[in-house]
């Protein structure tokens, strides 16, 4: 009987761990796929042309908007009613940005953003998102970045300063 419990644990534990990992991976998938019709509500550009720069906001009612960079996503976030009348920032469910190195959507609220670098996005000077501080620091050093910000540190004034650099 004791051997049976050991065998059960040796089989069930890996299956359980694999299930948890798979559930975590599936939970990280974006809720919608980008199409050729999706346009940035801030600048009007077709977003599918810029996969390295895509950002995404999903609302509680399932509505969503893609952006051609984190900068336009923040502009929308700071003035939701202007870019999407009838919506408010309080009804946002999820926000994603694309990790610059991995080109995968990541949670915008946990990302690290490099500003002031020599790399330009589709709309000029951009915030470049990274999933971890180490990657952001490496990029900052390689591309003459000025600083690394967290989501809550990005302000309308910072976004305006990026636009003025153009």
Question: What residue ranges belong to the model's regions?
Answer:
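Sec/Tat signal peptide C-region and signal peptidase I cleavage site
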Residues: 23-27
């Amino acid at each position: 009987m004791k051997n049976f419990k050991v065998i059960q644990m040796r089989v069930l534990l890996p299956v359980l761990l694999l299930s948890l990992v798979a559930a975590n991976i599936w939970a990280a998938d974006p809720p919608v796929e980008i199409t050729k019709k999706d346009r940035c509500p801030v600048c009007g550009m077709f977003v599918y042309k810029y996969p390295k720069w895509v950002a995404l906001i999903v609302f509680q009612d399932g509505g969503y908007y893609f952006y051609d960079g984190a900068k336009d996503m923040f502009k929308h976030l700071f003035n939701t009613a202007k870019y999407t009348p009838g919506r408010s920032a309080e009804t946002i469910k999820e926000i994603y940005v694309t990790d610059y190195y991995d080109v995968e959507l990541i949670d915008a609220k946990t990302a690290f953003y490099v500003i002031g670098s020599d790399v330009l996005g589709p709309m000029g000077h951009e915030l470049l998102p990274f999933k971890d501080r180490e990657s952001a620091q490496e990029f900052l050093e390689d591309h003459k970045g000025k600083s690394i910000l967290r989501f809550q540190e990005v302000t309308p004034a910072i976004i305006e300063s990026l636009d003025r650099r153009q």
